[in-house]
Amino acid sequence: MFMVNLLMLVIPVMLAMAFLTLLERKTLGYMQFRKGPNVVGPNGLLQPFADAMKLFIKEPLQPLTSSTSLYIIAPTLALSIALIMWTPLPIPYPLVNINLGVLFILATSSLAVYSILWSGWASNSKYALIGALRAVAQTISYEVTLAIILLCILLMSGSFTLSTLIKTQEHTWLLLPSWPLAMMWFISTLAETNRAPFDLTEGESELVSGFNVEYAAGPFALFFMAEYTNIIMMNALTATIFMSAIHSMNFPEFFSINFTLKTLLLTTIFLWVRASYPRFRYDQLMHLLWKNFLPLTLAMCMWHTALPIFLANIPPQT
């Protein structure tokens, strides 16, 4: 039964990821006054399947001087971690109900750094290694603010479980009292998933393609799938933390529809940002985090800690 539940989670996530690539190409197309993919199937609807077939049928070439085992493990690990992160997410019921669900997601997202680092090192290429080091520095840096923002939210809900966060938001979304945190969280998730305007790991002008420059065919497709799965996952987490739907025991499907629509809306904003903004310079990227976001989030954390103590109150769900 567990295997059936697992497949019922993995297959829709993979399908969503496939059609997100199409949605992105269509969105960018229309924002640049062109059509986007429109040949394969009606209105280009079968384009993701054509891309998948093309990539997985091609021969996976690798550099002679590369470290074979790590070269193959890195993309597999990237996709595995991207899928494992979905397990504690309530949609409205999680696959595995973990007490420390929020902490689990934060810890698992940190592991994604290893796949990027290994891929850059195992490729035995200067460009790939520089791209990987950039990605690691960026991801580790922005995880600091993500963790502090999550701490502020957990101080409001009083529990590490995601289902408690849903209960906390029965009366009002946490987006309303903590909108500065939500804005910083959203920008940090853009940086965490290496998306524009923070896609410095893939700076074509200086790094050819970034950490995946030596990858082709299937392994490259796995990195690509992991990136888009992470995007949907981060937006799903944002929807759960800041804009959770009310969960009714009688109509759990209403929660699922509401949750899906919010995730789709946030994902579309990700694509919109990519079409609208140019890439940051690397020093600006780090300046934004260490000089702007970190002091602000620390101040907000102190505020959220002091407020319940000052009012002699406790969070609602403890």
UniProtKB/Swiss-Prot annotation:
The chain crosses the membrane at residues 2-22, 71-91, 98-118, 146-166, 171-191, 222-242, 253-273, 294-314. It comes from the Eukaryota. It is found in: Mitochondrion inner membrane. It is a multi-pass membrane protein. The keyword Secreted does not apply. GO terms for cellular component: mitochondrial inner membrane. GO terms for molecular function: NADH dehydrogenase (ubiquinone) activity. It catalyses: a ubiquinone + NADH + 5 H(+)(in) = a ubiquinol + NAD(+) + 4 H(+)(out). Pfam families: NADHdh (PF00146). GO terms for biological process: aerobic respiration. Its main location: mitochondrion. InterPro entries: NADH_UbQ_OxRdtase_su1/FPO (IPR001694), NADH_UbQ_OxRdtase_su1_CS (IPR018086). The keyword Cell inner membrane does not apply. Its EC number is 7.1.1.2. Keywords: Electron transport, Membrane, Mitochondrion, Mitochondrion inner membrane, NAD, Respiratory chain, Translocase, Transmembrane, Transmembrane helix, Transport, Ubiquinone. It is an enzyme of class 7 (translocase). Core subunit of the mitochondrial membrane respiratory chain NADH dehydrogenase (Complex I) that is believed to belong to the minimal assembly required for catalysis. Complex I functions in the transfer of electrons from NADH to the respiratory chain. The immediate electron acceptor for the enzyme is believed to be ubiquinone. Belongs to the complex I subunit 1 family. This is NADH-ubiquinone oxidoreductase chain 1. It comes from Nycticebus coucang. The lineage of its organism: Eukaryota, Metazoa, Chordata, Craniata, Vertebrata. The gene is MT-ND1.
